């Protein structure tokens, strides 16, 4: 077990409904973080970094999300880092989920999590389908779990962990 893990929390200049620009900005921010000393073990991207909050119809960005996921896998493998992929609009079984992925140092997906508590005043319930299960995983011998934004307002989620 590694005693200390270094986390790079990446803030991006997200441009609404411009996935190509946002993808380039994410890659640039991650490459810049690689130059930091000490070298980060884990990179963390923000919620809906690819599209912004949330262009309509969000479904049109599902294919862009597939490409973003592939980029994250490749980046994690190429640079030997863990990558928590913020969240992306993912189409699965006829629904759209606000999903985050976790990739290990070899680029393998070790977990994913669908946001469980959608923010009604923000209109998320009209756009996304809520997730139904927690996601825990291990990083260098440390157990970790995920939540996305509004999820933090529900302590029962964290008690269940």
Give the role of each language-model region.
Residues 70, 91-161:
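Active-site catalytic loop in hydrolytic enzyme cores
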Residues 12, 48, 152:
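Active-site metal-binding loops of divalent metal-dependent hydrolases
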Residues 10, 43, 145-147:
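Hydrophobic positions in the central parallel beta-sheet of the AAA+
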Residues 19-20, 28-105, 112:
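Cys-nucleophile CN-hydrolase/nitrilase-fold catalytic domain and related Cys-dependent amidase chemistry
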Residues 2, 83, 138-140:
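RNA-binding accessory domains that recognize and position tRNA/RNA substrates
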Residues 11-17:
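Short polar catalytic/cofactor-binding loops
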């Amino acid at each position: 077990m590694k005693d200390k893990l270094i986390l790079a929390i990446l803030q991006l200049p997200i441009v609404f409904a411009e996935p190509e620009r946002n993808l380039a900005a994410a890659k640039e921010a991650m490459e810049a973080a690689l130059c930091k000393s000490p070298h980060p073990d884990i990179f963390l991207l923000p919620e809906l970094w690819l599209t912004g909050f949330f262009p309509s119809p969000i479904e049109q960005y599902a294919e862009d999300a597939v490409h973003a996921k592939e980029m994250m896998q490749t980046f994690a493998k190429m640079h030997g880092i863990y990558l928590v992929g913020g969240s992306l609009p993912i189409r699965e079984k006829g629904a759209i989920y606000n999903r985050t992925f976790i990739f290990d140092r070899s680029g393998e997906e070790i977990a994913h999590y669908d946001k469980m508590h959608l923010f009604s005043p923000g209109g998320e319930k009209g756009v996304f389908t809520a997730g139904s299960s927690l996601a825990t995983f291990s990083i260098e011998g440390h157990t970790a779990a995920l939540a996305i934004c509004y999820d933090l307002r529900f302590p029962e989620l964290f008690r269940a962990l």
